[in-house]
């Protein structure tokens, strides 16, 4: 979050890693998936400002602003801008999930399900690698003590096991278009239901990733 990083393709790195790469991979794999395959996007509760997670609320105007932030004016200071890019990228995961569900229902004979998942805060990960050293220490060692409590603070192993159950549990075989905080189904943020944003994200993602019609059954 300390400064803006870019992928080798020229896209802002948070956006490229958290959304665009997943969008491209899913589309390239759809034709090879079994008829009852499952897709789970790893999102975050930080996409919803009502969660009061201590992160700036996401702002979605157009996907290209996310891909090329330095070319677009922003009032955010550097640290705040980086954290807002993170929460907005997680909102993109929700947009992508909803749009993918709609397109699969309209354009595919397969019964592929698509859901989104919030693994919670995982102190062991490298999310805070660019934070101040004191902040990194607190996040890694102090918050790590709270994984034994009911709050949505989890070890990587626990979140990984929950994610695996989302794509293997027979009780969820036909569940699609849902969002889970751990194993609990939750509503997504008010902004996440914006159909115009969902379609804009999809269309611009096709353009940015240079996805071709012969590469995806949804084009």
Kindly label every feature range from the protein language model:
Residues 1-131, 211-219:
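Rossmann-fold NAD(P)H-dependent dehydrogenase/reductase core
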Residues 3-7, 74-78, 139-143, 180-185:
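Surface-exposed beta-strand-to-loop junctions
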Residues 92, 96, 159-163, 201, ...:
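Alpha-helical packing segments of well-folded alpha/beta enzyme cores
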Residues 141-186, 195-197:
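C-terminal helical subdomain
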Residues 195-219:
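Intracellular terminal tails of multi-pass secondary transporters
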């Amino acid at each position: 979050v300390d400064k803006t990083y870019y992928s080798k393709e020229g896209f802002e790195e948070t956006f490229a890693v958290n959304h665009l790469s997943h969008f491209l991979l899913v589309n390239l794999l759809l034709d090879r998936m079994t008829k009852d395959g499952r897709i789970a996007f790893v999102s975050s509760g930080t996409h919803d400002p009502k969660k009061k997670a201590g992160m700036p609320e996401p702002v979605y105007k157009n996907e290209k602003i996310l891909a090329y932030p330095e070319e677009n004016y922003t009032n955010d200071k550097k640290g705040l801008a980086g954290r807002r890019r993170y929460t907005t990228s997680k909102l993109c995961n929700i947009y992508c999930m909803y749009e993918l569900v709609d397109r699969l229902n309209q354009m595919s004979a397969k019964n592929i399900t698509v859901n989104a998942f919030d693994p919670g805060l995982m102190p062991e990960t490298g999310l805070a690698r660019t934070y101040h050293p004191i902040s990194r220490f607190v996040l890694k060692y102090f918050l790590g003590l709270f994984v034994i409590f009911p709050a949505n603070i989890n070890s990587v192993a626990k979140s990984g096991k929950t994610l695996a159950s989302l794509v293997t549990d027979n009780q969820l075989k036909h569940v699609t278009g849902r969002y889970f905080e751990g194993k609990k189904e939750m509503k997504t943020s008010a902004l996440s239901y914006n159909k115009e944003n969902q379609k804009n994200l999809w269309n611009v993602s096709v353009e940015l990733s240079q996805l071709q019609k012969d590469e995806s059954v949804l084009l």
